[in-house]
């Protein structure tokens, strides 16, 4: 069994449901230290973070990843135990974190070892930024490490995030940007009363409905060359006492924007307030911005190096995509670094029987290794 697969199994067999790292980062640090990495644990609150760097000069390429995983769900529904990292007869490894994203960490660790052994005098630096707070609130993880690095003026040019980016075959897609995410928590205030006496009450569901229709039907933008149109989606609506003869006193709505670079948080907020005010609603509205949109240009050195590495190993040309959810790349992109995401297939992430192909992990290791060569040698 190869070193990549052995490392991946060790990480996956370590139960680390967010925000618990449970020793994964110690395993990573122990592997990297003999390769010449300076190891720096960066804990914030209950979250474990690791910054490890080999080299003093630029350019600096950072591999960013997370050791925390989402809960397994009912373990009895799994074909193999979720923390077993079992490999079946078809070469498929099962386990929580196989795709998202402990296997990617193992691949980059081995790729780095192979690269340093082959090119001990490489130009630039290689670093690892690993957190146990990506699947949770993401407030004491990557964002705090970035703040600490910026405070001491430690900069880097490139960042490869090992999130599962592939759709149908390994390396068919590179995420070179992400949409922003803005959430709203809206409370429409009415007047509670008996359902038989509507003239003595004000039903907030009724008063909200026309405004909500305007929000849903509004074309916020048409997108651009890099992003699809901005999306507005309602996730929750809560109202009523549970009784069938009471007009509710309020209605609470949770909604979310996934927005392109055609919008700003301020423009989206203004649009919502304009709609609510035009319907003369009595409301409270709280906002939460969890990420700004970012884009890494297709002609940048990082995308060129990664695309070439995929072509070298897979014989295919990847497409560039900004679809999907947010990742910690949103925090890293604010530094000005070129950021992309490249990892295994994403079709089983967060699901029962999350799994990856062992052969894909061997190929991904070589893609990562070739990326280092393309950036730091050629």
From Swiss-Prot:
SUPFAM superfamilies: Bacterial exopeptidase dimerisation domain, Zn-dependent exopeptidases. GO terms for biological process: diaminopimelate biosynthetic process; L-arginine biosynthetic process; lysine biosynthetic process via diaminopimelate. Its EC number is 3.5.1.18. Zn(2+) 2 binds at residues 100, 135, 350. The keyword Transmembrane helix does not apply. Binds 2 Zn(2+) or Co(2+) ions per subunit. Pfam families: M20_dimer, Peptidase_M20. Gene3D superfamilies: 1.10.150.900, 3.30.70.360, Zn peptidases. Coiled coil: none annotated. It is an enzyme of class 3 (hydrolase). Zn(2+) 1 binds at residues 66, 100, 163. Its cofactor is Zn(2+); Co(2+). One of its GO terms (molecular function) is cobalt ion binding. It catalyses: N-succinyl-(2S,6S)-2,6-diaminopimelate + H2O = (2S,6S)-2,6-diaminopimelate + succinate. Pathway: Amino-acid biosynthesis; L-lysine biosynthesis via DAP pathway; LL-2,6-diaminopimelate from (S)-tetrahydrodipicolinate (succinylase route): step 3/3. The active site is at residues 68, 134. Keywords: Amino-acid biosynthesis, Cobalt, Diaminopimelate biosynthesis, Hydrolase, Lysine biosynthesis, Metal-binding, Zinc. Catalyzes the hydrolysis of N-succinyl-L,L-diaminopimelic acid (SDAP), forming succinate and LL-2,6-diaminopimelate (DAP), an intermediate involved in the bacterial biosynthesis of lysine and meso-diaminopimelic acid, an essential component of bacterial cell walls. Belongs to the peptidase M20A family. DapE subfamily. Homodimer. This is Succinyl-diaminopimelate desuccinylase. It comes from Hydrogenovibrio crunogenus (strain DSM 25203 / XCL-2).
């Amino acid at each position: 069994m190869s070193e990549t697969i052995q490392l991946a199994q060790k990480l996956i067999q370590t139960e680390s449901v967010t925000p618990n790292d449970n020793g994964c980062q110690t395993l990573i640090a122990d592997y990297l230290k003999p390769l010449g990495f300076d190891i720096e644990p960066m804990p914030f609150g209950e979250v474990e973070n690791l910054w490890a760097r080999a080299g003093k000069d630029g350019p600096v390429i950072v591999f960013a990843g997370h050791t925390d995983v989402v809960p397994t769900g009912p373990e009895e529904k799994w074909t193999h135990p979720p923390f077993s990292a079992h490999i079946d007869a078809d070469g498929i490894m099962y386990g929580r974190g196989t795709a998202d994203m402990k296997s990617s960490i193992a691949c980059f660790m081995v790729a780095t070892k192979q690269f340093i052994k082959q090119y001990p005098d490489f130009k630039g630096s290689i670093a690892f930024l690993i957190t146990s707070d990506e699947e949770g609130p993401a407030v004491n993880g990557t964002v705090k490490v970035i703040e600490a690095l910026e405070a001491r003026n430690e900069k880097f040019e490139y960042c490869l995030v090992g999130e599962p980016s592939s759709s149908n075959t390994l390396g068919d897609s590179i995420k070179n940007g992400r949409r922003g995410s803005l959430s709203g928590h809206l409370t429409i205030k009415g007047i509670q009363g008996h359902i038989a006496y509507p003239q003595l009450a004000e039903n907030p569901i009724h008063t909200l409905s026309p405004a909500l229709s305007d929000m849903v039907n509004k074309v916020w933008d048409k997108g651009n060359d890099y992003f699809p149109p901005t999306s507005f989606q309602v996730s929750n609506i809560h109202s009523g006492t549970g009784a069938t003869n009471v007009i509710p006193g309020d209605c609470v709505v949770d909604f979310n924007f996934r927005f392109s670079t055609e919008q700003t948080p301020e423009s989206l907020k203004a649009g919502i307030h304009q709609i609510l005010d035009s319907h003369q609603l009595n409301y409270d509205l709280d906002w939460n911005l969890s990420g700004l949109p970012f884009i890494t240009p297709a002609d940048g050195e990082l995308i060129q190096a990664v695309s070439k590495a995929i072509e070298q190993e897979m014989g295919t040309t990847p497409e560039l995509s900004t679809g999907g959810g947010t990742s910690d790349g949103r925090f890293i992109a604010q530094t000005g670094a070129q950021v992309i995401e490249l990892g295994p297939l994403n079709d089983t992430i967060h699901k029962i029987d999350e799994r990856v192909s062992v052969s894909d992990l061997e190929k991904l290791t070589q893609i990562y290794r070739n990326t280092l060569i393309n950036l730091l040698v050629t």
